Amino acid sequence: MIIGFGNDLCDIRRIEESLARFGERFIARCFTDIERRKSEGRPSRAASYAKRFAAKEACAKALGTGLTQGVFWRDMGVVNLPSGKPTLALTGGAAERLALLTPPGLTAIIHLTLTDEFPLAQAQVIIEAVASEASFRPMT
């Protein structure tokens, strides 16, 4: 069952301007250490940060809070599964909100897609609640 959906477009030029104007202060305020390492190693640094920024905005929308109610930028971090597929790791207020959204006996899975084509970066987040292994009972 889908319990949340969010979409966001981010202008890469806006992120370039923020990086130039605020530098480390902007990066430290918005991005996790994992995101920073990933983005700093990319040839298109601003596009990488813009995709992650869009992912956070989309996630906040999917959670139904925006960046309010105790949900902060660094509570949402883009990470990659072993397959390479991107997803979001939630901590703090974002994790608490996700727990409130997830029906008892179900487990939340966050699906994330990222893309960019200068000057835009886009992210879509779908939060799905699925039967957890503990609540799964095979039919006999």
Swiss-Prot record:
GO terms for cellular component: cytoplasm. It is found in: Cytoplasm. Keywords: Cytoplasm, Fatty acid biosynthesis, Fatty acid metabolism, Lipid biosynthesis, Lipid metabolism, Magnesium, Metal-binding, Transferase. The keyword Aminoacyl-tRNA synthetase does not apply. The keyword Mitochondrion does not apply. SUPFAM superfamilies: 4'-phosphopantetheinyl transferase. Its EC number is 2.7.8.7. GO terms for molecular function: holo-[acyl-carrier-protein] synthase activity; magnesium ion binding. Its cofactor is Mg(2+). Mg(2+) binds at residues 8, 57. Transfers the 4'-phosphopantetheine moiety from coenzyme A to a Ser of acyl-carrier-protein. Belongs to the P-Pant transferase superfamily. AcpS family. This is Holo-[acyl-carrier-protein] synthase. It comes from Beijerinckia indica subsp. indica (strain ATCC 9039 / DSM 1715 / NCIMB 8712).
